[in-house]
């Protein structure tokens, strides 16, 4: 096991500035090369303080923005047009990037595709739901209407 300092938010692991203990291979092969984390060291403690200070400064402004975005997301149904065969079965499935693009095109706002969680794979037309984690404490549930392209 090795200690790493997260530099970006990693789903299921933590937020920027958190010190977490992960398996050696996970840190060496994924987190560090992708830039999601740095190896923990005593000098890294200063980096943690800087990351946390920057996050605290951003949080005050983003709480209101996140609440506003949440209300806009939950008030509107996002329409996705995808290729489908007979019976409403999709060719492939709806991905988080498709949802993020549809949200942006509908004029609601920008959403990071990594923050979108789809509980069950969307492989058919119809109405579905997905959740978007805007912040650690603010989660929006959006309604999706998947329709077949003509």
Curated annotation (Swiss-Prot):
Task: Identify the GO cellular component terms for this protein.
Answer: ribonucleoprotein complex; ribosome
What are this entry's molecular-function GO terms? rRNA binding; structural constituent of ribosome
Determine the domain of life of the protein's source: Bacteria
Q: Which UniProt keywords apply?
A: Ribonucleoprotein, Ribosomal protein, RNA-binding, rRNA-binding
PROSITE patterns for the chain: RIBOSOMAL_L9 (PS00651)
Name a Pfam family for this protein: Ribosomal_L9_C
Q: Which GO terms describe its biological process?
A: translation
Q: Which family does it belong to?
A: Belongs to the bacterial ribosomal protein bL9 family.
Instruction: Explain the purpose of this protein.
Output: Binds to the 23S rRNA.
Name the record gives this protein: Large ribosomal subunit protein bL9
Species the sequence originates in: Clavibacter michiganensis subsp. michiganensis (strain NCPPB 382)
Query: What is the name of the gene encoding this protein?
Result: rplI
């Amino acid at each position: 096991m090795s200690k790493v300092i997260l530099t970006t938010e990693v789903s299921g692991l933590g937020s920027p500035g958190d010190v977490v203990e992960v398996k050696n291979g996970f840190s060496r092969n994924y987190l560090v090369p992708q830039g999601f984390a740095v190896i923990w060291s005593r000098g890294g403690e200063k980096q943690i303080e800087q990351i946390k200070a920057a996050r605290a400064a951003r949080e005050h402004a983003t709480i209101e923005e996140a609440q506003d975005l949440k209300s806009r997301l939950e008030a509107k149904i996002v329409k996705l047009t995808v290729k489908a065969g007979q019976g409403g079965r999709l060719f492939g499935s709806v991905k988080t990037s498709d949802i993020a693009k549809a949200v942006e095109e509908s004029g609601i706002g920008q959403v990071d595709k990594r923050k979108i969680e789809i509980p069950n794979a969307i492989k058919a037309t119809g109405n579905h739901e997905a959740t978007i984690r805007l912040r650690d404490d603010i989660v929006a549930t959006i309604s999706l209407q998947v329709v077949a392209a003509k």
